[in-house]
Regions:
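Hydrophobic helix-cap positions at the C-terminus of alpha-helices
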Residues: 28, 32, 110, 114, ...
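A basic- and aromatic-enriched beta-loop-alpha substructure that forms the phosphate/nucleotide-
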Residues: 34-57
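Short loop/turn segments at strand-loop or loop-helix junctions that form parts
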Residues: 1, 42-45, 80-85
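A glycine- and Lys/Arg-enriched "phosphate-lid" helix/loop adjacent to the NTP-binding pocket
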Residues: 55-132
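Short amphipathic alpha-helices and their capping/turn segments at secondary-structure boundaries
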Residues: 18-39, 62-75
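C-terminal accessory "lid"/substrate-recognition subdomains
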Residues: 115-122, 129-164
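Conserved substrate/cofactor phosphate-moiety recognition/catalytic segment
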Residues: 1-26
Length: 164
C-alpha cells in the first residue's frame, strides 16, 4: 500500500499521508478478503496507526483509533517481526535506525491494547530463514489437518490487482 501513497512516507510522512495508508490498507483488504480462504499481509492497520501516531506526537487527530481497534479484530493472527537485522536499501523502507526504533517503541506501547496476547506471535526477523517453520504457525491458526480420503486438489487462479 505504502508504495502508492501520493502524500509522502517514512520520516517525511504527514498525518494525512498516514491516514491515506490506513484507509488504503483497509480498502485493499476488503477487496481481497473474498478472493481467498486466507489473506496474508506484510503489515496490519495497527502498524500504520503507529506511523500515524509518530507523525502526530501520539495524538489521533482523525479519531481512527476505534476503527483500527475494530479492524484488528478481523485478523486471526499477528506475527510481529522484531527488527534485529540490518536495514537494507529497497527504495521504499527507511534505512534510518532511529526512525525504526521510534516506530517499534510505539508498537511496544499500543500492541497490547489492540491485539489479544493469544493472537500475537513475536519472532526475531533474524529467525526468518529458508528453514523457518511457517507450518507450525499455520497449524496454530487453522489447527492440525484432518485426515481426508479422496481429496482432490483444486486449481488456484491468481487475479492481479491494482496493487500487484
Amino acid at each position: 500500500v505504502i508504495r502508492f501513497n501520493p502524500l509522502g512516507l517514512n520520516e517525511g510522512a504527514t498525518p494525512e499521508a498516514q491516514l491515506w495508508v490506513i484507509m488504503a490498507q483497509i480498502q485493499q483488504e476488503l477487496e481481497l478478503r473474498n478472493r481467498a480462504e486466507m489473506l496474508v499481509t506484510d503489515r496490519a492497520v495497527v502498524d500504520n496507526f503507529a506511523y500515524l501516531l509518530r507523525t502526530t506526537g501520539g495524538e489521533d487527530p482523525f479519531s481512527v483509533r476505534p476503527l483500527v481497534r475494530r479492524w484488528c479484530e478481523t485478523y486471526d493472527m499477528f506475527v510481529r517481526l522484531l527488527p534485529d537485522v540490518p536495514l537494507k536499501v529497497d527504495g521504499v523502507r527507511s534505512t534510518n535506525t532511529r526512525f525504526r526504533n521510534e516506530i517499534e517503541q510505539i508498537l511496544d506501547t499500543i500492541l497490547p491494547s489492540f491485539i489479544p496476547e493469544d493472537r500475537l506471535i513475536t519472532v526475531r526477523a533474524s529467525e526468518i530463514t529458508e528453514r523457518f517453520d511457517w507450518g507450525s504457525l499455520i497449524e496454530r491458526l487453522v489447527g492440525l489437518p484432518e485426515e481426508a480420503e479422496n481429496v482432490v486438489a483444486q486449481p488456484v487462479t491468481l487475479i492481479p490487482t491494482l496493487w500487484d
